[in-house]
């Protein structure tokens, strides 16, 4: 008799747990009906960089999520396009710049990115002055 009561209690507990898991799965399905989200660019709340928002749409649903635009991003190719860059090339004497090429490593949030990009920067002069005046301690 005692074994039968224990068995019924265990069976009842199993049913309760199973129904709770089923309800949880149902809630997840309702919230994730949309599978193809289209995300816009991250728009900083103030200035050119820092914290901001990104809007996403899927059918009639719209979501707004927090995002961050790094302050060292290059506007030409966007903050959501991540590139792997080669080493800087030699200095071009006629233009006074050096260049390197980057290949697309990752496009975040379905961003439209170029496969390869080329960036330039001014050549730096080789002669940098490293001499600094040393301050003596109070003897004049």
UniProtKB/Swiss-Prot annotation:
GO cellular component terms, A-Z: cell projection; extracellular region
Gene3D superfamilies linked to this entry: Heparin-binding Growth Factor, Midkine, Chain A- C-terminal Domain (2.30.90.10), Pleiotrophin/Midkine, N-terminal domain (2.20.60.10)
Highest rank taxon of the organism: Eukaryota
Entry's Gene Ontology BP terms: adrenal gland development; behavioral fear response; cerebellar granular layer development; cerebral cortex development; cytoskeleton organization; defecation; dentate gyrus development; estrous cycle
Signal peptide from the UniProt entry: 1-22
Keyword Iron: no
Upregulation: By retinoic acid. Induced after tissue damage. Induced by inflammatory cells, in particular, CD4(+) T cells under inflammatory conditions. Induced during the early and intermediate phase of fracture repair.
Tissue specificity statement from the Swiss-Prot or TrEMBL entry: Expressed in the follicular epithelium and granulosa cells of the ovary.
Location of this chain's protein in the cell: Secreted
UniProt entry keywords in alphabetical sequence: Developmental protein, Differentiation, Disulfide bond, Growth factor, Heparin-binding, Mitogen, Secreted, Signal
InterPro entries: Midkine_heparin-bd_GF, PTN/MK_C_dom, PTN/MK_C_dom_sf, PTN/MK_diS_sf, PTN/MK_N_dom, PTN/MK_N_dom_sf, PTN_MK_heparin-bd_GF_CS
GO molecular function annotations of the record: chondroitin sulfate binding; growth factor activity; heparan sulfate binding; heparin binding
Annotated site location: Required for high affinity binding to PTRZ1 by interacting with the chondroitin sulfate chains of PTRZ1: 100
Any Pfam family matching the protein: PTN_MK_N
SMART domains reported for this sequence: PTN (SM00193)
Consequence of gene disruption: Homozygous knockout MDK mice are viable and reproduce normally. Mice have no apparent abnormalities except that postnatal development of the hippocampus is delayed. However 4 weeks after birth, mice have a deficit in their working memory and have an increased anxiety. Knockout MDK mice exhibit low to moderate levels of auditory deficits and generally respond at around 50 dB. PTN and MDK double knockoutmice have a deficit of auditory response.
Disulfide bonds: 34-58, 42-67, 49-71, 81-113, 91-123
Family per record: Belongs to the pleiotrophin family.
Function: Secreted protein that functions as a cytokine and growth factor and mediates its signal through cell-surface proteoglycan and non-proteoglycan receptors. Binds cell-surface proteoglycan receptors via their chondroitin sulfate (CS) groups. Thereby regulates many processes like inflammatory response, cell proliferation, cell adhesion, cell growth, cell survival, tissue regeneration, cell differentiation and cell migration. Participates in inflammatory processes by exerting two different activities.
Subunit structure: Homodimer. Interacts with ALK. Interacts with LRP1; promotes neuronal survival. Interacts with LRP2. Interacts with NCAM1. Interacts (via C-terminal) with PTPRZ1 (via chondroitin sulfate chains); this interaction is inhibited by PTN; this interaction promotes neuronal migration. Interacts with NCL; this interaction promotes NCL clustering and lateral movements of this complex into lipid rafts leading to MDK internalization. Interacts with LRP6 and LRP8: this interaction is calcium dependent. Interacts with ITGA4. Interacts with ITGA6. Interacts with ITGB1.
Protein name: Midkine
Organism lineage: Eukaryota, Metazoa, Chordata, Craniata, Vertebrata
């Amino acid at each position: 008799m005692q074994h039968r009561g224990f068995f019924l209690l265990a069976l009842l507990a199993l049913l309760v747990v199973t129904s709770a898991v089923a309800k949880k799965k149902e809630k997840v399905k309702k919230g994730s009906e949309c599978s193809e989200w289209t995300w816009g660019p991250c728009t900083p709340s103030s200035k050119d960089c820092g914290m901001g928002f990104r809007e996403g749409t899927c059918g009639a649903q719209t979501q707004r999520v927090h995002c961050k635009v790094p302050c060292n991003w290059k506007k030409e190719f966007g903050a959501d396009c991540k590139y792997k860059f080669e080493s800087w090339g030699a200095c071009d004497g006629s233009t006074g710049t050096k260049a390197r090429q980057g290949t697309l490593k990752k496009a975040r949030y379905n961003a439209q990115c170029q496969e390869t990009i080329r960036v330039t920067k001014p050549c730096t002069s080789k002669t940098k002055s490293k001499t600094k005046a040393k301050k003596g301690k109070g003897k004049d």
